[in-house]
Amino acid sequence: MSKVSVFGGGAWGRALAFALAEKNEVRIISRRDISSLLEPLNQKLKTLNCTSIIQVSHKEALDAQYFVMAIATSALREWLAVADLPQKIKILCASKGIESGSGAFVSDIMEERIAHKSIAYLCGPSFASEVVHSLPCALVIHSRNLELSREFGTLMPHFIKTYASPDVVGGEVAGAYKNVIAIAGGICDGLAFGMNAKASLLARGLVEMSRFGEHFGAKMETFLGLSGAGDLFLTSNSTMSRNYRVGLGLAKGKAINEILKELGEVAEGVITAKAITEIGQRENIYTPIAREINLIINGKNVRESSKALMA
């Protein structure tokens, strides 16, 4: 049984801790006390004859064979600067997004501190609320070190099927960009535009994210698979998606600060829309949906903007 430490006590971090506890000894670290949130998960694990998830200190968490990163992209650089991670490390990053201001991808931030051969990235269609009920799903573990991808795959529970891919850029662009398209999907549904419009929006969104990714060397096949189309269709069609709910709120005319306060959680697509817009302008990449979502987030009338979204 391997020792796995999960950094991040949010919904996704807790879900991954639960999933990994089927085969491993799992500890979790969070800035807040999450013992009450771990209790129902540990009760389920007990019925499955699995070890409980334990919340530990940062120092205790460093005593592990594998590390899983599930913290917000906006906090990633700051966290890595003080994490004091061991030299020999195997880390699975489940963070999705693009850093605001710098426009850095998650891999750029990670690889400033950790060798790329030691990092893998988890992508694909997966709601935390379904993972904690052991519902089946399929994910992709991207890494320039495919042996590491497959090694992390062996840690996963029976209900998660994993595939290995060397296309790190494709995986992280898809994982970040789909959150922006999901906001657009929420707006489309919130304005009751119908399924014809929704299909058009998602198809164009897939093309847009693919174009953006290919500019940075990503492979088209990544966007047609689980990390791209799979995650996009899931996130853009369900109220289980925070970014989709942001879109619903914007469609009602709510201000972004009000929506985020109601959510009480991070919605990566809000920051990512701005980052993609800035990168698109700098690199001369056509990003019409991301650009329009960024304008709506910053106060443009949603009905007026919807014409441009569907153009």
From Swiss-Prot:
Keywords: Cytoplasm, Lipid biosynthesis, Lipid metabolism, NAD, NADP, Nucleotide-binding, Oxidoreductase, Phospholipid biosynthesis, Phospholipid metabolism. GO terms for molecular function: glycerol-3-phosphate dehydrogenase [NAD(P)+] activity; NAD binding. The keyword Nucleotide-binding applies. One of its GO terms (biological process) is glycerol-3-phosphate catabolic process. It is found in: Cytoplasm. Sn-glycerol 3-phosphate binds at residues 96, 124, 126, 178, 231, 241-243. Pathway: Membrane lipid metabolism; glycerophospholipid metabolism. Coiled coil: none annotated. Transmembrane segments: none annotated. GO terms for cellular component: cytosol. NADPH binds at residues 12, 31-32, 96, 128, 242, 266, 268. The keyword Ribosomal protein does not apply. It catalyses: sn-glycerol 3-phosphate + NAD(+) = dihydroxyacetone phosphate + NADH + H(+); sn-glycerol 3-phosphate + NADP(+) = dihydroxyacetone phosphate + NADPH + H(+). Gene3D superfamilies: N-(1-d-carboxylethyl)-l-norvaline Dehydrogenase, domain 2, NAD(P)-binding Rossmann-like Domain. PANTHER family: GLYCEROL-3-PHOSPHATE DEHYDROGENASE (PTHR11728), GLYCEROL-3-PHOSPHATE DEHYDROGENASE [NAD(+)] 2, CHLOROPLASTIC (PTHR11728:SF1). Belongs to the NAD-dependent glycerol-3-phosphate dehydrogenase family. NCBIfam families: PRK00094.1-2, PRK00094.1-4, PRK00094.2-1. Catalyzes the reduction of the glycolytic intermediate dihydroxyacetone phosphate (DHAP) to sn-glycerol 3-phosphate (G3P), the key precursor for phospholipid synthesis. This is Glycerol-3-phosphate dehydrogenase [NAD(P)+]. It comes from Helicobacter hepaticus (strain ATCC 51449 / 3B1). The gene is gpsA.
